[in-house]
């Protein structure tokens, strides 16, 4: 979701939302931080290219260990900026306590949800929110996405549950989302809205989102023809040293 409130934003000459006095420092990002921002921008545009998002849908964040006076922070995409017009300087750095540390634009409206997931799971290093078609079909039906493809069970690590619909812009929603996902599965569906995927890297979180969308399509098509075989993560015997596809 990418809506913004007129009560808290103004619009820049480029047509982008700008915080009123709430922006953090505009210090030039470090080389490592800039590389993280470039990776986020790449996967934002890739999400549109492969059909996971459209227009300004979705958002991405990455954990920055120790970036806030020794505590973790995150860098997150801004609110309501098209990915083809976004630059690395548009992204916002926020402490896990919600303090904006760097950035001239407003962070994604779903920032509180990202923060709750990072707080619950220290293993999570990146979050990808998408609004893809087949995930949303199953989400609108309130139907859990069971793994029927290898990539789904390898990356998501189990069935992906569906939350009942509600607005996803507050910490209470974030806590419920993180609780439903749990500690062993790496995705959750927001009913009538989209998917939130996590990973130990942005590359992995993106692969989770791709795998769940592909699986959702196959699950729908296979269910129309019969009863698909559901895979169980614990039953998959991955050979030692094997690399994930």
Named regions from a protein language model:
Residues 2-245:
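Glycine-rich flexible loops
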């Amino acid at each position: 979701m990418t809506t913004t409130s007129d009560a808290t934003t103004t619009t820049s000459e480029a047509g982008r939302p700008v915080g009123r006095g709430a922006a953090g420092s505009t210090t030039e990002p470090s080389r490592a931080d800039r590389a993280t921002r470039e990776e986020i921008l790449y996967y934002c545009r890739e999400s549109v290219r492969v059909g996971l998002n459209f227009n300004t849908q979705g958002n991405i964040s990455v954990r920055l260990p120790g970036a806030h006076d020794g505590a973790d922070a995150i860098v997150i995409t801004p609110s309501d900026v098209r990915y083809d017009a976004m630059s690395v300087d548009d992204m916002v750095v926020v402490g896990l306590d919600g303090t904006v540390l760097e950035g001239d634009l407003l962070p994604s409206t779903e920032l509180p949800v990202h923060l709750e997931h990072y707080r619950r799971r220290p293993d999570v290093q990146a979050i990808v929110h998408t609004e893809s078609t087949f995930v949303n079909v199953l989400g609108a039906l309130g139907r859990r996405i069971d793994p029927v493809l290898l990539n789904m069970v390898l990356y998501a690590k189990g069935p992906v549950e569906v939350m009942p619909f509600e607005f996803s812009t507050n910490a209470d929603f974030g806590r419920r989302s993180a609780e439903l996902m749990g500690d062993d599965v790496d995705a959750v569906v927001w009913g009538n809205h989209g998917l939130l995927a996590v990973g130990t890297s942005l590359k992995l979180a993106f692969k989770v989102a791709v795998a769940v969308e592909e699986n959702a399509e196959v699950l729908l098509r296979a269910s129309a023809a019969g009863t698909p075989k559901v895979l169980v993560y614990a039953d998959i015997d991955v050979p030692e040293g094997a690399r994930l596809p």
